[in-house]
Amino acid sequence: MKLPSSHIKAISIDAISLDKNALSLSISADIDFDRFADFAEPLVAALDCTVRERQWGADRHQWLLEFEGTQLCLNYEFYGNICWLSAEREADFDVLEYLATLLKSHL
C-alpha cells in the first residue's frame, strides 16, 4: 500500500553513488538495522516503488521492489553498514539513474 504524499516521512540521505558495472545505486545514510523499515518504507515511497517481498537475516535486509515493471532489490548489510539498490539486467540501469535523480532532493 502506498501512502499519500502528505503522509510520507522525510528521508535523510548523506550520499548516493551509481555503479554501472555492479548495476547498483549505493545509498549512504544513518540506518538502524533493527529499525530498517523506518528508513526503507519512506525511501520506497519517495521512489514510487512497490514492495513485493521482504527478507531479512542475522545481518542483512533484502527487499524485492518494483518500479514501473522493473524489479529491483533494496539491500542493507549491517556489518558493512551499506545500503544499495540493484538491478538484475543491464538494460534496467537507466531506471537506477532515474531513481538517483529522485534521491538528489533528499541529500
PLM regions and their residue ranges:
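Negatively charged, low-complexity tracts enriched in Asp/Glu with abundant Ser/Thr
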Residues: 2-56
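A generic structural signal for beta-strand entry/edge sites
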Residues: 20-24, 60-62, 80-84
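Amphipathic, interaction-prone secondary-structure segments
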Residues: 47-73
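Short, compact, well-ordered microdomains
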Residues: 64-103
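Short, charged, intrinsically disordered terminal tails
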Residues: 105-107
